[in-house]
């Protein structure tokens, strides 16, 4: 292992001579010595030695199959049919980057067209782009879009306080440069959006955003009414929805949404430590809205010979048109994630998606019922996936005690919402087993 393949020493010496330096140290002599550190890497190893070392390190991890996990709060453990991974790993789909001559990749464009078509049916809105980075990005882009639709005359965007801190951070980061004011509406005693406070906040706003199930997991019962309040104030109505709940709940379009957003990666994609993801972005059939959509839209047409062809119908990003006219600076989308979502959704079909939603709802209700035996559920109502649980002891201590018993507890939200005290979100999906819930409750009886 004594040879220098990288960096190539001969090439390095040649480059140094060309720019008039004798050594690398001389080249970086203006860097203060106190900031320099020794770069002491160990010697090289064989591939087998590296394999053994990495395997030993990775074996310390515990997957959601090996260790009962009740973590949720935006990242959930769903079952993915085996063929989804097989199909997206085919070379026709698994590419390094979005092609700059996309019409060459007819298979990829058709897959994205199918994704758009299925999401349009699912969200009840006819026009869907080929994905954003994630749910939070979709909300932020929707906020900017509502301002553009008002020609900059309205610069306020209303969101619920009971929203994921990560989504909120993305929204604030995205909109800061546009001088957009983000207005938060608190929850009422039921844990849902406070309608009276919304009526006060909506005045002169560009858009109003609400989620069909908020960060606490509570299903919002007044989505249609919230939309009516937004429209009466002249604001656009943006609805966020988890696609796995849309087999059993009304679609955002049916509830009056002008724009709908969501997280496509909940279908067909593993947790992956939180990413990559794919944001859903859909609008109603209004040319004014379609022209202001971010991202890219795949369309179906006929070529010069009359054959069916898939093309990028709209791609209003800054690399393709004048920057001042661009609707977004997103340079790529999450095409592979979107294709995986489309494959999973096509596998489920309407009946399978309904059954998936019913199982999640049933498992969430069972988890809530059992958790109420050992702790307080702050809000009553219908929950989907997440359930808030309030404890008397510091939750950090409880969480560590659960880990010691081989159980991953919920996500502590007291740090984001101090008014909720020692509260954590515990999540259930179709993968949650009753024996896991039983083990959790027995453990909590000891440590909580």
UniProtKB/Swiss-Prot annotation:
Reaction it catalyzes: N(6)-[(R)-lipoyl]-L-lysyl-[glycine-cleavage complex H protein] + glycine + H(+) = N(6)-[(R)-S(8)-aminomethyldihydrolipoyl]-L-lysyl-[glycine-cleavage complex H protein] + CO2
SUPFAM superfamilies hit by this protein: PLP-dependent transferases (SSF53383)
The protein's Enzyme Commission number: 1.4.4.2
A Gene Ontology BP annotation from the UniProt entry: glycine decarboxylation via glycine cleavage system
Gene3D superfamilies: Aspartate Aminotransferase, domain 1, Type I PLP-dependent aspartate aminotransferase-like (Major domain)
InterPro entries, sorted: GcvPA, GDC-P_N, GDC_P, PyrdxlP-dep_Trfase, PyrdxlP-dep_Trfase_major, PyrdxlP-dep_Trfase_small
Pfam families: GDC-P (PF02347)
Keywords: Oxidoreductase
UniProt keyword Transcription present: no
UniProt keyword annotation of Oxidoreductase present: yes
Source organism superkingdom: Archaea
GO molecular function terms attached to this record: glycine dehydrogenase (decarboxylating) activity
Function per UniProt: The glycine cleavage system catalyzes the degradation of glycine. The P protein binds the alpha-amino group of glycine through its pyridoxal phosphate cofactor; CO(2) is released and the remaining methylamine moiety is then transferred to the lipoamide cofactor of the H protein.
Subunit structure comment from the entry: The glycine cleavage system is composed of four proteins: P, T, L and H. In this organism, the P 'protein' is a heterodimer of two subunits.
Family per similarity comment: Belongs to the GcvP family. N-terminal subunit subfamily.
Protein name: Probable glycine dehydrogenase (decarboxylating) subunit 1
Source organism: Thermococcus gammatolerans (strain DSM 15229 / JCM 11827 / EJ3)
